[in-house]
Amino acid sequence: MAWQGIEGHDDVVEQFRRSLARGRLASTYLFVGPQGVGKHTFALKFAQTLLCAERPAELLDPCGYCPACMQVLAGTHADLLTIGKPPDRSEIPVQLLIGAGDRRMREGLCHDISLKPFMGGRRIAIIDDADHLNEEGANCLLKTLEEPPPKSVIILVSTSADRQLPTIRSRSQIIRFRHLECGVVADLLLAEQVTTDREEAQRLANYSEGSLVRARALADPELWKFRGELLKGLAEPRPDSLRLAKAVVAFVDEAGKEAPPRRMRARQLVGFAADFYRHLARRLNRAEPPADRELAAHVERAVATWPADDETAAACAERCLDALAHIDRNANQAVWIECWLDDLGRLVTGRAA
């Protein structure tokens, strides 16, 4: 059941419903979970719940039409503070937390959250992209969390609790958001008219890792065209790893200069490869071919000339999963892409160490 238009997080809704009913509102929350599953949207709706002038917060049902609710949606509510990483920066500037120059400690979120509420009964701060707090910024924020101002609520939005200082984790109530189910992602894509075709929406959802942001990014014809080239190369009995690596690096570079879109594209391609090898391993064990017709064609071609066994195909899929886990940790995309594809080639031809 959707809460305020947010799908897939009924357990989180119930957790907050119980807390509010018991009057146990924390001063700091740490929202953690995969990118693109609705954490920031949930934070805004929760802020709207706490600031709504027409309905008590215990109902967890903001009216949506009072001035306070409208201002939250418009980003103009005087008691709602939001900061995040600027698009052109790799970190959240410490100035957003404590001010700059001679205004240091007299401006910024840590100062502003300490002020008395202007309109509602609370002051609320949302720190988006909290993964990108640097050490100085995190330590400045910690001072506020250690002595939270009365009637204040701070929400940090992060992908993982491990990305925060232990001292911040210990002072926060951690709220975990899970991947969205594929059916939910497909329904949202159709509702947003990313596509009007149910089969296409399901295909995008299947590769989205439960993230609506990733599903939207998958709706790119050039991406699927390149997937065909990648799978054609992987289906060869002796993959040309160097040629494939050059092509993959070039395609990832086309995503732009910023790291997030490049990493997302890399994840997409590694995910395609992992799916190919999973289906290949199953097909070598006489399982049914995949429903995706293009993928099935590449798998059948590989089955006919595969120089190894199903365990090798499964090992290749596992190597792709290892690559997915390391994408965010590697600054040099070209190097890890070359290593990943070289490892696959060695596994297929029996040259692995």
Where are these regions (language model features)?
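Charged, glycine-rich active-site and insertion segments that engage polyanionic ligands
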Residues: 2-49, 150-152, 159-272, 277-353
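Loop/turn-to-beta-strand initiation segments
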Residues: 120-124, 149-155
